[in-house]
């Protein structure tokens, strides 16, 4: 599918302006979803979504201009003045007082072009392996996403005037230039903004489900990897791709649709820590009991439709503990600005100093979590209630110590 939207504003460009300032916003999106049966039991899934946004509009925020217009006094100045005998060459003569701004000049003095794009593409391979084991399935997928944004402002310096004299009989007026040396009609490019990022991720999955008599089981194993890069790095280290690797498994068991047990773990790797601390093991276990399906509660099913108790405990790891430095196990060295020398006759010198000491003991921040929950429904779902008792304890929290305790 292809979709395109175009929105325009209601700002009028002055006839003496050499560029358009009205808002013009275009949005285009493309979406593709394909399911391809390669052969019996083998499927290929393709998903793609792309958006393109382009914006042209006034340099100043329209909300700011409207706010200034609300408080502007029309007695102080006119939006623009006609030419007088002195300032009669073709240009916009914006009115202004020394104590307030002209909102019309803010809108007409320049424009900004902005563009934003993003694309997400995913390819998945699915194969049914029931010929090896009933309920066994293999999945592998790779996805690529990219996003970018740029903004370029273009501006002039308005010519501001005040009304010095006005003859009510002849209608002749005299203007006073408030900024004759600073005003310019030439468009100048301001400081632009450019950002971008891309990410590549892949997953390999093994799934298995089975059911026999009163028993049900399910198994899932996932090997995942991810790498990302910012297109506008601030340093050499920021220009290196960020990478993560993980292996996770989950096994669940159910009996008579009343009793459930589940165990899982994640074995994750991060590049941010020293060699001995890059891998983290994070297990979890949980169970649930659907009390409403017990024989001793079947007589209350008219008013108690559902009652479930659940309990879980697990650990979750976090490697995004600090933005800077990126690699906490590497020292950081910075250069000071030139300053006075330590010895006469040497002039100014630049000094190098350690801005961050390496720490080989920093590792994953661990959130240890426990949860006790209750879910219930009354009168066939007319009333529902969910109650959770939750506790979380964090370990290995990284913090800056400003005062060393005695």
Regions found by a protein language model. Name each.
Residues 77-87, 389-392:
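Functional cleft and adjacent loop/helix regions within the main domain
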Residues 33-38, 42, 48-52, 71, ...:
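Extracellular/periplasmic, surface-exposed regions of secreted and cell-surface proteins
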Residues 52, 57-58, 63-64, 164:
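Charge-rich, acidic-biased intrinsically disordered regions
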Residues 88, 92, 98-99:
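The feature marks either
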Residues 1-7, 12, 73-80, 327:
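Short intrinsically disordered, low-complexity coil segments enriched in acidic
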Residues 160:
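Active-site-proximal polar cores
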Residues 1-57:
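Transmembrane beta-barrel wall of Gram-negative outer-membrane proteins
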């Amino acid at each position: 599918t292809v979709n395109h939207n175009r929105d325009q504003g209601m700002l009028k460009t002055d006839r003496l302006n050499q560029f358009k300032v009205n808002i013009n916003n275009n949005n285009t999106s493309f979406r593709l979803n394909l399911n391809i049966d390669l052969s019996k039991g083998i499927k290929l899934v393709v998903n793609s979504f792309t958006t393109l946004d382009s914006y042209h509009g006034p340099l100043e925020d329209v909300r700011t201009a409207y706010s200034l217009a609300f408080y502007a006094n029309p007695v102080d100045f006119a939006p623009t003045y006609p030419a007088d005998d002195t300032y009669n060459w073709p240009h916009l003569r914006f009115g202004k007082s020394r104590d307030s701004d002209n909102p019309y000049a803010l809108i007409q003095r320049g424009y900004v072009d902005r563009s934003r794009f993003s694309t997400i593409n995913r390819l998945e391979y699915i194969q049914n392996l029931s010929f090896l084991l009933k309920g066994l399935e293999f999945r592998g997928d790779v996805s690529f996403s990219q996003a970018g944004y740029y903004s370029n402002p273009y501006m002039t310096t308005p010519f501001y005037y005040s009304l010095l004299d006005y003859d009510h009989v002849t209608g002749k007026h005299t203007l006073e230039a408030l900024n004759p040396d600073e005003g310019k009609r030439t468009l100048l490019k301001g400081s632009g903004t450019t950002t971008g990022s891309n990410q590549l991720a892949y997953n390999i999955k093994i799934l298995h489900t089975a059911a026999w008599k009163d028993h049900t089981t399910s198994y899932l194993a996932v090997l995942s990897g991810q790498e990302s890069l910012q297109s506008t790095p601030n340093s050499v280290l920021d220009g290196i791709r960020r990478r993560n690797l993980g292996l996770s498994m989950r096994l669940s068991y159910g009996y008579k649709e009343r009793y459930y047990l589940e165990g899982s773990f994640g074995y994750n790797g991060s590049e941010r820590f020293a060699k001995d601390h890059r891998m983290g093991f994070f297990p979890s276990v949980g169970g649930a009991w659907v009390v409403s399906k017990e024989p001793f509660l079947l007589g209350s099913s008219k008013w108690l439709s559902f009652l479930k108790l659940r309990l879980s405990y697990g650990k979750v790891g976090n490697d995004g503990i600090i933005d800077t430095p990126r690699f906490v196990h590497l020292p950081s060295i910075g250069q000071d600005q030139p300053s006075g020398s330590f010895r006469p006759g040497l002039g100014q010198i630049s000094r190098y100093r350690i801005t961050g000491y390496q720490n080989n003991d920093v590792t994953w921040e661990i959130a240890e979590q426990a949860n006790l929950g209750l879910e219930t429904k009354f009168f066939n779902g007319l009333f529902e209630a969910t109650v959770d008792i939750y506790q979380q304890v964090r370990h290995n929290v990284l913090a800056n110590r400003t005062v060393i305790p005695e």
